[in-house]
């Protein structure tokens, strides 16, 4: 059996955990959900960049558990909104907002914006912290357009309103295997794996 690397996923977001575990399986790694550990303090995402939040999560979790940890911060950058919601993507409609509340607020803010000006990207920054080593940071992006109506039932977050012209589908219409080829998280993971080879 090949040597498998164990890494704590510094997130409680189950959508991200599932996606990371599919990506980890391809690389021979094992991602351990933060939910499997009792008493781990919540990491406050108070940085103003994806990299700052990803590093903070990975460093704090790795230090607390004395294990390798992978921090992720990702979000949606909408050009017509000057990059918003950005690092506030998960809280766009409020601190405890649901995914649907967030994308509904986004659609409302873009009501008067033409289709050509609804360009956006999902961006992901990963930070891998291994005790005693320098952090490794990678980024990935997936370009698209914000649709006017939601479509699809796969995925999470803003996936139902994120249209990918090159695939002629919404992110939420992609099967996991398709998403793992083109998503911002998959691209950041591929870059990370290249760095640590």
Question: Where do the language-model regions lie?
Answer:
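Anionic-ligand binding patches
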Residues: 2-8, 14-33, 37-197
